[in-house]
């Protein structure tokens, strides 16, 4: 990201031919199609990656993503997961109410809406700028990744608090290419690339799970305090999040179908009545 184009330009760069493909979060394109955000992340929704991955590959999620990208002449090869995010913070945020007035980095889309609903002000910046923004006090907390991902970015050098489990995000990333580039591949190679992308995802999930456990030792050495919200707060945040689902469903016809699909699968899982 940033080596050729900025993260907000990656999507349009496929059309101009600057790039043939990219690996990023669909939510960054929610201004072009709101469904990208609710495909990418479902705050207050799934409890683990397996539930989300099953929605993508067994309940039609990948078809929604491909439909959204087809509008631009692109093909979504597959989804890549990494795990449930936590939130590094420079100040102690011990409850939902403590989010009020805080400056938080959050991506465009439904996650930013959730932060706003909790009373925070949000800033959308690429990951490469988060450390500097934390260090200079531009933001006080950040949405970014799992414990080890945040630690590798150096965030816990300036953040002495970590909100865990994360209440806000367990997103998917996408590997998307231009349809023209995809069509040049023989069918057997296309199949190989799709299968390899699924393998890439689960290799990432298991590696990061191991690294998250190892990062706990490093956080202790850095003097980072792990904070968990009261369970009642997590329940309230889930209620707020689910209200946002309906708000997002009204943004486009595709968004409505995506939300309906999430709800149907969540009911099958017993996550919703």
Which residues does each predicted region cover?
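N-terminal secretory/targeting leader peptides
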Residues: 1-52, 60-273
């Amino acid at each position: 990201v940033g080596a050729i184009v900025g993260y907000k330009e990656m999507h349009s760069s496929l059309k101009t031919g600057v790039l043939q493909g990219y690996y990023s979060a669909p939510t960054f394109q929610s201004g072009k199609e709101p469904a990208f955000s609710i495909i990418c992340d479902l705050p207050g929704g799934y409890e683990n990656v397996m539930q989300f991955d099953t929605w993508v590959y067994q309940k039609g999620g990948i078809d929604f993503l491909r439909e959204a990208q087809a509008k631009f002449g692109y093909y979504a090869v597959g989804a890549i997961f990494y795990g449930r995010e936590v939130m590094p913070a420079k100040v102690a945020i011990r409850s939902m109410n403590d989010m009020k007035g805080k400056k938080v980095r959050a991506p465009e889309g439904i996650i930013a809406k959730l932060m706003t609903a909790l009373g925070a002000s949000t800033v959308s910046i690429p990951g490469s700028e988060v450390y500097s923004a934390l260090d200079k006090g531009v933001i006080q907390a950040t949405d970014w990744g799992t414990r080890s991902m945040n630690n590798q970015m150096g965030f816990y050098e300036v953040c002495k608090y970590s909100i865990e489990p994360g209440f806000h995000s367990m997103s998917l990333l996408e590997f998307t290419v231009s349809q023209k580039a995809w069509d040049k591949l023989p069918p057997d190679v296309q199949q190989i690339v799709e299968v390899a992308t699924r393998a890439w995802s689960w290799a990432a999930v298991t590696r990061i799970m191991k690294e998250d456990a190892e990062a706990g030792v490093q956080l202790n050495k850095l003097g980072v305090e792990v904070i968990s919200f009261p369970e009642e707060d997590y329940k309230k945040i889930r209620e707020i999040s689910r209200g946002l689902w309906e708000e997002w469903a009204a943004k486009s016809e595709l968004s409505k179908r995506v939300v309906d699909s999430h709800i149907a699968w969540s009911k099958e899982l017993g996550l919703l009545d």
